[in-house]
Amino acid sequence: MSLLDTLQRGLADLDAQGLRRVRRIADTACDARMIVNRREIVGFASNDYLGLAAHPALVAAFAEGAQRYGAGSGGSHLLGGHSRAHARLEDELAGFAGGFSDAPRALYFSTGYMANLAAMTALAGKGATIFSDALNHASLIDGMRLSRANVQVYPHADTAALAALLDASEAETKLIVSDTVFSMDGDIAPLAELVALAERHGAWLVIDDAHGFGVLGPQGRGALAAAALRSPHLVYVGTLGKAAGVAGAFVIAHETVIEWLIQRARSYIFTTAAPPAVAHAVSASLKVIAGDEGDARRAHLAALIERTRALLRNTRWQPVDSHTAVQPLVIGSNDATLAAMRALDAHGLWVPAIRPPTVPAGTSRLRVSLSAAHSFDDLARLEAALIEASEAAAASVGAARQEAAA
């Protein structure tokens, strides 16, 4: 059998299971209201939590950065591609989100995936043990595999199980690794307990705050600031393409850790640096995030979250108890979840269906992703469509059961 035959059979299997992903094409800027596939929709799919992706100040800064530095960086960070915009942004990030450390330093990456690969592969290796939450992001998992460290997975957010694993470990280097806000459930890791366990067992704690940076904590400084946590043994990863509205990611840690990443992190060394204009736009984003406008956007987002929590309980499906901008609604089967997504699409609402392997089998769900750009009218429209779709689904299941019993 040829490779193409193998791939075609694999795609057919995905179709049979309702698991093939399809890209939609956006014709306008990321916003609450967009033109997607040539139709106007209200989008509940993006991670643009503060609604900054189309913010005029960020757009202007991006254009200004391109005029000043050009369209591309021209090389890797170690071979001519590290611009003043990159260096300034790293200093700003360390000052903004590095309050957990006495000597913080930041390192900018092109993507969150690359930042997590760097942290895992450069800080752990043969002889080290990584203790990983069962629901950690795929980029962390891939980094662990590449690191060649021993990986022990503990049940999601189960600090008692983690403590038992740490007690039994004789590894010289120990890393506890966890998302902060889990991207498919919206819950928040028990960070205070994780920090305490790390300090008690001489371990380092690496956290991925992709969905918390910009949203959680005073001025949006992130999950560690929200919990008022400090420790010299923390490595903090954040992304800049979600709440910050631009692109890229960063690692903040003690200056020695960052210097080691510069020297040894392959996903930092062996790739072209992101365009300086991107870093210039992120600097503008940080000003908005930290200012009064950022506070107002976070307050509006918090109100939207509470309203959404209430409206999801009015459906016949199972909402997940989340207090973040990620609001999942578990339906169960792939086919039923796809049918619900299509029903919402018919109302001009884009709410993505999340299916295995992203989530466990039998827990396919709609993932409502909120943005400060949404209005309460948008939520009212969403509620009406969800109730209609869930009632129709329940009626369909009831009819099928009656037919089977006949």
Swiss-Prot record:
SUPFAM superfamilies: PLP-dependent transferases. It is an enzyme of class 2 (transferase). One of its GO terms (molecular function) is pyridoxal phosphate binding. Pathway: Cofactor biosynthesis; biotin biosynthesis. GO terms for biological process: biotin biosynthetic process. Pyridoxal 5'-phosphate binds at G112, Y113, S183, H211, T239. Its cofactor is pyridoxal 5'-phosphate. Keywords: Biotin biosynthesis, Pyridoxal phosphate, Transferase. Substrate binds at R21, H137, T358. It holds the Pfam family Aminotran_1_2. InterPro entries: Aminotransferase_I/II_large, AON_synthase_class-II, AONS_Archaea/Proteobacteria, AONS_Proteobacteria, PyrdxlP-dep_Trfase, PyrdxlP-dep_Trfase_major, PyrdxlP-dep_Trfase_small. It catalyses: 6-carboxyhexanoyl-[ACP] + L-alanine + H(+) = (8S)-8-amino-7-oxononanoate + holo-[ACP] + CO2. The modification N6-(pyridoxal phosphate)lysine is found at K242. Its EC number is 2.3.1.47. It comes from the Bacteria. Homodimer. Belongs to the class-II pyridoxal-phosphate-dependent aminotransferase family. BioF subfamily. Catalyzes the decarboxylative condensation of pimeloyl-[acyl-carrier protein] and L-alanine to produce 8-amino-7-oxononanoate (AON), [acyl-carrier protein], and carbon dioxide. This is 8-amino-7-oxononanoate synthase. It comes from Burkholderia cenocepacia (strain HI2424). The lineage of its organism: Bacteria, Pseudomonadati, Pseudomonadota, Betaproteobacteria, Burkholderiales.
